[in-house]
Structures are given as C-alpha cells and as structure tokens.
Design a protein with these regions (language model features):
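Bacterial N-terminal signal peptides that target proteins for export
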Residues: 2-11
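Hydrophobic helical h-region of N-terminal Sec-dependent signal peptides
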Residues: 12-16
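Charged, low-complexity intrinsically disordered segments
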Residues: 24-169
Length: 169
C-alpha cells in the first residue's frame, strides 16, 4: 500500500513534466533539417518560392507542380515557376534553408511565417519568425546579415547532426 501511495503522490508532478516537455519551444519531437520542412517534407509550408520574386507576395503552391531539391519537396503555383526554380534553385530558395534569418543571426534555428514575415533583399528571399521580427530584421538588414552569414554554417551543421537549438511556433 505504501508503494501505491508513493506512486500516486508523484503522479501530478509526472503529468505536469510530460505536458511541459511536449509544448512548443525546442522540446518538440519534430525533426529539424538544413531546410525547414513540415511533417511531409514540404518546404516553406508549400508556398511558391519563385512567386515572392515575381509577384511580390506569398502564393500557395500546388502539389501537382512539385519538385525535389536539397532533401525537400518544393511546391509551385505553375509549371513556369517550377521550371524557373529547377533552372536556378539557389536564386529562388530562401536563405538559410527557410529558417528564421533573425534567429540564425543569434545562432539558433527558428520556424518561420512565410505569409507575413518575408523580405527580398538584394535578390535573396529571407524569412522570419513573425511580422514583428521581420520588421526588426528589416530595420537593420546589414547588421543582421553580418552576424548571420558566419553563423549559418555552424547552425546548418548542427541541424544536420540533430544538435541545433530549434524554436517551433
């Protein structure tokens, strides 16, 4: 009977611990890779990376116009956009594998909001955590890029080895 009392006395603490481990932050069981993908391996939540450059807004891609590149599936709004990407993926794919540019500058990977937190700077697509972070990043692009460029190779290696600090929405 004493053993049962002990087990039940610890039960609330164990339940709370499991709940805390499963909520947000870097405690997520979601896998991280050098390219930010969803659970199905789709990059930038299925948004067409070429459309940001051509029409200046986030446009949802279609599975029927998908291609594989850099261990990720990329969706496009049209065959034309898919072909442009296939011809020059580095030109259209987001910097830092689609991870948050602001986070990379601080040495960690963070999920991004491809609808409200994106910028084209000097021909390169950058994504950020949310609209406010994107506004902050845009206020000092040069400063953040100076910090993030040398850190990306380290974060990228950590992502590939499963050792990166990752922040999920």
């Amino acid at each position: 009977m004493t053993l049962l009392k002990t087990i039940f006395s610890w039960m609330p603490a164990l339940v709370i611990a499991f709940l805390v481990m499963g909520c947000g932050g870097s405690g997520s069981s979601r896998q991280a890779s050098a390219v930010l993908v969803d659970e199905l391996g789709i990059a930038i939540q299925g948004f067409d990376p070429v459309a940001y450059h051509l029409v200046g807004k986030a446009v949802q891609g279609k599975a029927e116009y998908a291609t594989q590149w850099n261990a990720a599936t990329w969706w496009f709004f049209s065959k034309v956009n898919r072909q442009l990407f296939i011809t020059s993926p580095e030109k259209y794919a987001p910097a830092y594998g689609g991870w948050c540019a602001y986070g990379i500058a601080d040495g960690y990977a963070a999920e991004t909001d491809p609808i409200n937190a994106w910028t084209i700077h000097q021909g390169q697509l950058y994504l950020n955590w949310n609209a406010q972070v994107s506004t902050d990043w845009n206020a000092d692009k040069a400063g953040y890029l100076k910090k993030s460029e040398p850190k990306w190779s380290t974060v990228q290696k950590q992502l590939q080895e499963g050792e990166a600090t990752v922040h999920w929405h």
